[in-house]
Amino acid sequence: LRQISAKPISLPEMADRFTRHNAGITFCTICLACIVFVGLRGRVGTRPLQRVDSGISTHRILNLGTLNPIYNLRAAWAEFRFLSDFFSSSRLIPDESLKEHARVLVSALNPATNTVPVVPASMSNASVVDFSWPAWQRTAAGSPTRVPKHVFILFMESYDSWPFLEKYRELGLVEEGRKLSDEGLRLMSYLPGDNSSLFSSLVCLQGIFETNRARQQSIPTSLANAFNRLGYVTRNINGFSAEWSSCERIAREQGFKEVYCTAQIKPGGDTANFQVHDRTLFNFASEKLTYDQPTFNFIRSSSYHGPFEVDLKAEKCEISGIPEHLRMKGMRDENELRQAYGTLKYSDRMLGEFVRKMITRHPDSLFIITGDHYGRHFITTTPDSYEGSSVPLIMYGPSVLEGISFPEGTAGSHVDLATTLIELCAPKGFEYASLGKNLFKPFPDSFGVGRDFVIFPDAVVCLRGKPDCISLPWQKDASLNDQQREDLIRRARELHDAYHAIGYMMTRRSLENALR
């Protein structure tokens, strides 16, 4: 050490000596490349640092600051491109087409009249897509039963309809949902608003299709808007981080007064991607929040979203295997199915425990249970149009739902949920805007519109690629002839295109006015 200290070497001299050798140059280059590579990815691991990983604190600006500039620049560019596309002139819908879409919707939403509503030729494009247009206005009739003090929408990850069908019952995947629906109400001719969690939640909460995920608003058709006006404390409770699809920002823009994500529920989460298990989520909602005032609670689960990290053995939710008679051609890997179905069983059990606990504490509560979209883990890779699209609508609340039921021949989707809940909770004379139906009101020729699918009381139509129409599974003796299929496909296309076109233009005009 004394010899080394007696002959000090400057840093430039050391670097010069080191770089005289090819091995040193190579080593330095590799180290520098690794540092740059890891820096750009943001972490050491199989997956680069993503926006979902940044929701680790309760402060959004601090969260975004954890991401590297390259990633933030790319994210900003993607959002800019999305907004540019949303407001592109090429997406504008011609006046005549818009008027025809409006005529289809007005006619569909007012079937009790014997005359088809006429859209005046002089009507401007702007009036049809204004939230204040008379055809979109509703006046609540007053709740037919006891008004709920607390409303809970359990927006369950991939909680679809097919496990409720009798032929799959022995799998035992949704026994809690089945029991609650047997004691309450269940609608199986029902569709999600979209085929992804984010966009489906936007339809459910905003009561309209095609809203802009990058710029949300508290619009007149929305659930948050209505329940704020009705005096409820509006809560948005999520089993994932605040930056997952910007869920915290979106909820606040929609008008929710309270927003809870992983950072508030359990900092760090339960999984590798900062999700919290459904047990943690529902325990937070039941034990950490107060209910001394009327509340509207939108709860989004995440356990049935990969990666599946629930300890199924500890939760006693393991699936032994797929019964022989349910095995079919094109069946997926059984080990993967068992893992997925065990997680679904766990998620279903957690929602059941939560509902039972809360209804005991707050008997004047209403619970709405539905899936965000159809699942991704069918037994076969080619499910039919019903099993590959539908989610159930379950409503539970003995004191609130006493004496009411879904009329025979009812079909619906997430876009109808706002209207249905407002009519259950609002006093007579309450005014609101809506493009949906009240599912408790008899409705001739009922229907439900989603993304690429339209459901009717006895059939479902898939509009992807070559359109297809099949009878619903419980319509055992019903067979559709070619003419009936053609008529339903044509009707489905009209309704689907009208809902999405009107929704897009209403949202676009509203945002354009807000940004001026």
Where in this protein do the model-derived segments appear?
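Solvent-exposed soluble domains appended to multi-pass membrane proteins
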Residues: 114-516
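N-terminal secretory/membrane-targeting segments
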Residues: 1-149, 166, 170, 174, ...
